[in-house]
Amino acid sequence: MFWSETLSIVQGIVVSCAAITGSIVAVRGLSTWKKQTKGHADYELARRILISLFRLRDAIDAVRHPMMWAHEIPLPPEDQAANMEQNKIDHYGRTQAYQARWDRVQKERTNLYADLLESEALWGLELKTLFGDISSLQHELWLCVHRYLEISDPDTDAETRKALRDIKNSERNILYDNLSESGDDFKNEMRAAIERIEAYLKPKLIR
């Protein structure tokens, strides 16, 4: 009887220990799985944001390219062109070309928007803050292009053109990229802003 009771107790202890061990293993496994899942989510989000960032950089570079190719410059519809002077036809083509270049910038910003919202939910505000420098440079370039097109518009009256030129002359001229390897001030500021974002995101790409 003694040995039977002892054996039952031992068996109970063994079963309990096995259950506890199994629970510990399960909890550790769940913890590892959660870490792996979060790591994968961080990796994918960081990868998407970096790719979109590089595409945005290239789109902004394209806006500033000093050459405007013939295929970029459309003619107005024939019924409109027939009643337009050449300087207005030229301005129409330039405006459409810059609009097409800027549409590409807007497309990449739109692609970034949802991912930046997700990053804010997962990582906080730091990345959004880092993108503030990119947004400021983008807005500065937009104003520069907008003023250039207004000044060159044949329909802009002389007084408005003078006022716009005064504003333009008080600001730095960033319309054209100088295409040097070292880069101009605008490009170097953009590079520095991108490097700060890369430094934040690249640790999240380590798996």
Report each predicted region and the residues it spans.
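Interfacial juxtamembrane loops and adjacent helix segments
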Residues: N87
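Amphipathic, membrane-active segments
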Residues: S31, K35-L75
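An amphipathic alpha-helical interaction surface
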Residues: Q80-N83, Y92, Q96-R207
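Transmembrane helix-loop junctions and nearby membrane-interface residues
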Residues: S23-L30, A62-P66, C144-I151
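Interfacial loop at the N-terminal end of multi-pass membrane proteins
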Residues: M68-Q80, D90-G93
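Membrane-embedded hydrophobic alpha-helical segments
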Residues: M1-Q36
